[in-house]
From Swiss-Prot:
This is UPF0309 protein Lm4b_02611. CDD domains: SIS_RpiR. InterPro entries: RpiR-like_SIS, SIS_dom, SIS_dom_sf, SIS_GmhA/DiaA_subfam, UPF0309. Pfam families: SIS_2. PANTHER family: PHOSPHOHEPTOSE ISOMERASE, SEDOHEPTULOSE 7-PHOSPHATE ISOMERASE / DNAA INITIATOR-ASSOCIATING FACTOR FOR REPLICATION INITIATION. It comes from Listeria monocytogenes serotype 4b (strain CLIP80459). Belongs to the UPF0309 family. Residues 31-214 form the SIS domain.
Length: 247
């Protein structure tokens, strides 16, 4: 099974390289422009999609200007099934997005592989109303195969200024076994991480070419990194309180 899973995942990544690279580069340019003008990069996802927002937060080799919107009832540790119920509620996003410090010139990256549930769609639309540029990572194939749960009939792909397709199949899982009817081994976490890191790599290269020093963390396990990292925490702590919380 390892050969099958890796073969399929590699093909998905090759497809992203062939068909989504221009959108990734465009997204990277927008991220660079935002950071060069004191903007912040917000990320949001429900359920397992939220994992990707934490993957790029306070990350060795990653950008400091990253703000994951971590609304705990929509994560998994306060009730996995309950989070799925909440994700399907129209207008629920208003209960937590009103207080988010999203400003004109910021970037909002919203992740949802199915793209059908109301909360990610509403997050994208509220962020745009606040002046953010919206980047969406979703599966166009998966989304098109399912009816939208949003009252407007929209899917997440309808709410993005840039839409990047992670290529996930319907249901996300790609493997099957004889004598077992349920597909297993999802791919969207792998492809989503690659897409996000590629966007930020493009952004960092753009900033370097613009003679702007990218705000990139060094691993805290490398000697003499602490002062460098603390300076970045101090720079962004007002906009991203999670960076310095409980210090």
């Amino acid at each position: 099974m390892i050969n099958n899973y890796i073969d399929i995942t590699v093909r998905l990544l090759e497809n992203i390289l062939d068909n989504e690279a221009d959108y990734v580069k465009e997204a990277g340019a927008k991220v660079a422009e935002s950071i060069e003008n004191d903007g912040v990069i917000h990320l949001f996802g429900c359920g397992h999609s939220h994992i990707l927002t934490e993957e790029v937060f306070y990350r060795a080799g990653g950008l400091a200007a990253i703000h994951p919107i971590l609304h705990e009832p929509l994560m998994l540790h306060e009730g996995a099934a309950a989070s799925s119920v909440l994700e399907r509620k129209n207008d629920y996003a208003k209960t937590f997005m009103a207080e988010e410090d999203i400003r004109p010139g910021d970037i909002m990256i919203v992740l949802s592989t199915s793209g059908r549930n109301p909360v990610p769609i509403d997050v994208a639309e509220i962020a745009r109303e606040k002046g953010a540029f919206v980047i969406v990572i979703t599966s166009l194939q998966y989304s098109a195969s399912q009816k939208s749960r949003h009252t407007s009939g929209k899917r997440l792909s309808d709410a993005g200024d840039i839409v990047i397709d992670n290529g996930a199949v319907k249901g996300d899982a790609v493997l099957k076994s004889a004598n077992f009817d349920i597909a297993f081994a999802p791919t969207s976490t792998v492809t989503g991480a690659v897409i996000l890191q590629s966007i930020f790599a493009e952004a960092i290269e753009t900033m370097v070419n613009d003679n702007f020093t990218p705000p990139v963390f060094i691993s805290g396990n490398v000697e003499n990194a602490d002062a460098h990292n603390q300076a970045l925490v101090d720079k962004y702590n007002e906009r991203i309180p999670l960076l310095g919380m409980n210090l």
